[in-house]
């Protein structure tokens, strides 16, 4: 475990972009059946297992970078900033436009930025790790203002034609996924000091972050195409996952890091306005919250209407909570990320 006592960077702006095209779960099941001669699934199965009713789908002309850029343009406008005001761009996403160059370059070009850029990738924890990198660089005074963006395009990796139930089961995660983008502007906080007590209103910004991983479980879920292992294999271009093994992997990982982080910061869950937890399905959100001791009334339900947005899930939930009046300036919020590989992370933030 690694906990960073920070307070040196704050969230100056947050925006999310959800493509307008929607695909409900009935239509997903119908497309699977139409694309898979001789294969049938019980009607309503996906909804019953996941609780997901709808998800967003990017346009054929859009790329992952476009989703990030849409959100980034909104956050710069809302903060009254121009391209020269950004010191660093971090593209932090499980998705990418291509292997080379880094998608951060493509996003920067579309935004008209001329600052340094980098990609950060760690499955569904990519955005949370992007915040970690940005916060650390701001704390080191290398950069004063960092734009962290993500664009997730999982709809491009869904297997629609399945020959049998085993293939359907291993491809199941793709049927929960959704496209979207998000952007957070982090900047040095003038109102906080590194030694401010987290419980003090003066402790503004990112107060602490912690991450753990059990990388022995990496084969449980993969999208293997595009690397040296499967450079040209079309079969490797789809999501594959063993749901039961993934559940066991997260049980092995545990959630002690969450309690340890709160203890280090002298906080408990009741101190928070909301707790945003990465949501792969509605049932697993409830199971994880119960095991982690997170009160249900602090959660931000999102997966039912928006699907599994990968690394966009956490910023989307925070945006929903802000827009819905559930949190605001001075409030404590927690971002709890889970990701394939497997890893678990938490960021504690005072808005």
State what each model feature region is.
Residues 65, 69-72, 95-96, 106-139, ...:
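Claisen-condensing/thiolase-fold acyl-transfer catalytic domains that form or cleave C-C bonds
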């Amino acid at each position: 475990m690694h906990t960073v006592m920070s307070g040196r960077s704050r969230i100056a702006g947050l925006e999310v972009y959800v493509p307008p095209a929607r695909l409900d779960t009935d239509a997903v099941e119908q497309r699977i059946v139409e694309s898979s001669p001789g294969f049938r699934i019980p009607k309503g199965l996906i909804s019953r297992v996941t609780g997901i009713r709808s998800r967003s789908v990017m346009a054929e002309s859009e790329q992952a970078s476009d989703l990030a850029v849409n959100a980034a343009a909104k956050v710069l406008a809302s903060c009254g900033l121009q391209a020269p005001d950004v010191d660093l761009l971090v593209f932090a996403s499980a998705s990418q436009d291509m292997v080379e160059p880094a998608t951060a370059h493509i996003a920067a070009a579309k935004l008209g930025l001329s600052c340094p850029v980098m990609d950060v990738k760690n499955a569904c924890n990519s955005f949370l790790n992007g915040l970690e990198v940005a916060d650390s660089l701001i704390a080191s005074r290398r950069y004063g203002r960092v734009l962290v963006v993500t664009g997730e395009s999982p709809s491009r990796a869904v297997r629609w034609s399945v020959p049998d139930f085993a293939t359907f089961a291993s491809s199941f995660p793709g049927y929960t996924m959704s496209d979207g983008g998000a952007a957070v502007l982090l900047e040095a906080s003038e109102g906080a000091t590194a030694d401010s007590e987290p419980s003090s209103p003066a402790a503004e910004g990112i107060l602490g972050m912690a991450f753990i991983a059990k990388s022995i479980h990496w084969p449980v879920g993969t999208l293997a195409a595009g690397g040296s292992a499967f450079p040209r294999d079309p079969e490797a271009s789809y999501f594959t996952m063993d749901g039961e093994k993934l559940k066991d992997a997260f049980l092995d990982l545990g959630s002690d890091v969450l309690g340890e982080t709160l203890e280090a910061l002298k906080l408990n869950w009741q101190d928070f306005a909301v707790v945003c937890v990465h949501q792969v399905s509605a049932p697993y959100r409830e199971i994880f919250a119960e095991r982690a001791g997170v009160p249900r009334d602090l959660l931000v339900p999102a997966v039912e209407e928006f699907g599994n947005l990968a690394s966009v899930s956490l910023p989307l939930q925070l945006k929903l909570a802000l827009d819905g009046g559930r949190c605001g300036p001075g409030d404590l919020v927690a971002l709890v990320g889970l990701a394939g590989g497997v890893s678990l992370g938490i960021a504690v933030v005072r808005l």
